[in-house]
Amino acid sequence: MSRIGKKPVVVPDGVDLKINGTVVTAKGKLGELTRQFHEAITFAQEGKEVNVAVSGTDKKSSSLWGLSRTLLDNMVVGVSQGFSKQLEIQGVGYRAAVKGRTLELSLGFSHPVNYELPNGLEATVEKNTLITVKGYDKEVLGQACAEIRSWRPPEPYKGKGVRYVGEFVLRKEGKKK
């Protein structure tokens, strides 16, 4: 039994959820998301709640149960409230700026790094070192933030680089003579 899969997904007002077999479409004020689920997963909508069930008893089916429920919940929350992540830049001369749909990063390279934001995402920069990325698709948001961070991940000696706000970076001691 999946503890997460047993919980029903509550659909708030303003979100239109359409279930067509294994294809689920959520439409809200922020956008529209469509996802194809595994054929072992079934959905039952009762009013403002959606219950996720699994048809098989094998290990793969039961492992997909909680995942499918969480993915459905992320779709509903995303189109109604949206998600956001914050990245901070640490280092002398490291800064960021938004120009249209492009995030321009100065990360110590001989050239600026230009990152084109995917559709459905928007970024704002505060104090030149704090980037806030917002969107309604949690997967696209996480992937975009991981790509931004991958240009200059935090290094363990001085801590310079791009990191998530609140991320702990293990610091190392320098070489001793």
Curated annotation (Swiss-Prot):
Cytoplasm found in the keyword field: no
Gene Ontology cellular component annotations, sorted alphabetically: cytosolic large ribosomal subunit
Protein name as it appears in the record: Large ribosomal subunit protein uL6
Family the entry assigns: Belongs to the universal ribosomal protein uL6 family.
Signal peptide interval: none
Disulfide bonds: none
UniProt-listed GO biological process terms: cytoplasmic translation
PANTHER family: 60S/50S RIBOSOMAL PROTEIN L6/L9, LARGE RIBOSOMAL SUBUNIT PROTEIN UL6M
Lineage, uppermost ranks: Bacteria, Pseudomonadati, Pseudomonadota, Alphaproteobacteria, Magnetococcales
Pfam annotation, one family: Ribosomal_L6
The entry's keywords: Ribonucleoprotein, Ribosomal protein, RNA-binding, rRNA-binding
InterPro entries xrefs: Ribosomal_uL6-like, Ribosomal_uL6-like_a/b-dom_sf, Ribosomal_uL6_a/b-dom, Ribosomal_uL6_bac-type, Ribosomal_uL6_CS
